[in-house]
């Protein structure tokens, strides 16, 4: 689900990037001065779409041209690709993915982008937080949805929503339970 869609139904205090703006990928460099006025020198960029034209990343504005040029060459990103730009946020190294069907959490697993990282334990209020998110998504959850959350200095935050069919699986998830629910579904 596009950030521009779910950010309109999820309360802003639940979102990791509530301050985000949307720009076409090809317009980012032309808007560096405006981006700096809004967010300072360190920003986060990711595709608006869950189809992942590229992986989201944080960067300084000093490195922005290099980062975008690298992505353009490696990923062949279309200049019209809508892109979320927001301020950089401090987050835990461990993120949590929840696979949900019909407003029910089927399974979850931790994941991290850091090599040799020891996973954090699931925060005590994480399951309640995900059910709160699901309550705002009642129009969308009958299709199955994946919810990624992370702990921050300001509490749990929603990183993004994705489809079951476009999301990776991680060690620790209950694959058998998910497959059984998918078969019943």
Give residue ranges: language-model regions:
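Active-site nucleotide/adenylate-binding loops and adjacent lid/helix of ATP-dependent enzymes
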Residues: 1-137
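A short beta-strand motif that forms the metal-chelation/ATP-contact edge
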Residues: 99-100, 107, 155-169
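A long amphipathic alpha-helix within ATP-dependent nucleotide-binding catalytic cores
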Residues: 109-158, 177-185
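Acidic, proline/glycine-rich low-complexity IDRs
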Residues: 143, 168-173
